[in-house]
Amino acid sequence: MGLLISPFCSSSAEAKDFVVVIDAGHGGHDPGAVGKISKEKNINLNVALKLGKQIQKNCPDVKVVYTRTRDVFIPLDRRAEIANNAKADLFISIHTNALAKNRTAKGASTWTLGLAKSDANLEVAKRENSVILYESDYKTRYAGFNPNSAESYIIFEFMQDKYMSQSVHLASLVQKHFRNTCRRVDRGVHQAGFLVLKASAMPSILVELGFISTPEEERYLNTDAGTTTLANGIFRAFLTYKREQEIRLNGSSQTILPEDLPEEKDTTPAGTTPNATEKTVRQDSNSTPVSYTHLRAHETSAHL
């Protein structure tokens, strides 16, 4: 077992709560993208809960709010309303990507609100926004917005998002850790017209964890090691962002970054296979919360 590490964030009772809303995309009668062995809604929820637990365990000064913690349908505008009512400092929406049949791709991407500058980006926005079609009154709730019409997305061309720079910066941090910590294929930071981000009054990102339509990716997204690694990558990005914001606003921060901690000696037996490492992590996570030190051991082996 790895050594226990002190919380990364301030434990001061006087510290003002930093509020982060974690949104597991889709749910209930909306499965999201469907793969050969799984549904997007379940992958999203798995990673969202792991991310939230990491933050709650290591950051006593942070309040975590979920848009859902079980398999239920939440309208898009309600998700943003939850974040706005919580006066959130950050909104992180978690999704899983997909391509049409006979097309494959690998890797993770992070998105912010903006005008889609390519047909591919527009298609991602259309797919994520089409969830409103599950709502019987969507034409009224979304002022006639048609998620499948390119003309509807013109509204994003004239939007002024005052949180754009912060959102893009957080998205860049997430991609940095997906690439360097999780060893994922880095598909970059992109912009598109996502309704759930449009209605959120705080820095907001939408994360696409990988491609459920690619068999190898889908298998990875359904392993405990894979989802834990992805959640940890987002967690590291969150810590960095929070620390930077605290320094910018207060001149200092008590948030500790993982890379600032002393390196621990790797106790993983020589010749340990990825499967063996994954099994160990699964056993740990079923019995006790996975500590940061447990994560270090498998980050370099449980990846695509």
Q: Where do the model's predicted regions map?
A:
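Intrinsically disordered, low-complexity charged/polar segments
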Residues: 274-284, 288-292
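Conserved small/polar residues in nucleotide/adenosyl-binding loops
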Residues: 293-300
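Catalytic-core regions of hydrolytic enzymes
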Residues: 13-145, 160-164, 168-172, 228, ...
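Bacterial N-terminal signal peptides
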Residues: 1-7
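Active-site-adjacent mobile loop/cap segments within catalytic or ligand-binding domains
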Residues: 32, 152-253
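Flexible hinge/switch segments at interdomain interfaces of large molecular machines
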Residues: 142-150, 206
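Cytosolic catalytic cores of cyclic-nucleotide second-messenger enzymes
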Residues: 304
